[in-house]
């Protein structure tokens, strides 16, 4: 399981870079709320994460159902973190770091035991 988590984390680094760049563009160029910026960054990055983890981490096929399960769960998590950040007036960098940490752990557990549970 540690080996899988290391692979998931490696892909997560690239995913995080994608998410952070989009988040920054939304906040500083488009002047959106943190909730919208976090969700938009998520939407762009989650597809990369899903397909890369399916192929390289879990060696599983990609299906519409798996994609919807993954995107749905991670999307809800993204909105919750963004909403909480707006309510607490957190600086954007704190929002990004918080979401990155939470989504790494929760995303791995959810992927391993729900989305890709049948993968060999």
Swiss-Prot record:
CC terms in the record's Gene Ontology section: host cell membrane; plasma membrane
Cited InterPro entries: Glc_translocase_bactprenl-link (IPR016480), GtrA_CellWall_Glycosyl (IPR051401), GtrA_DPMS_TM (IPR007267)
Record field: transmembrane: 10-30, 34-54, 65-85, 90-110
Membrane topology: Multi-pass membrane protein
Gene Ontology terms: biological process: polysaccharide biosynthetic process
Subcellular location(s) of the protein: Host membrane
Primary subcellular site in the record, as a coarse category: host cell
Record keywords, A-Z: Host membrane, Membrane, Transmembrane, Transmembrane helix, Transport
Annotated function: Involved in O antigen modification. Involved in the translocation of bactoprenol-linked glucose across the cytoplasmic membrane.
Protein name: Bactoprenol-linked glucose translocase
Species annotation: Shigella phage SfV (Shigella flexneri bacteriophage V)
Gene from which this protein is expressed: gtrA
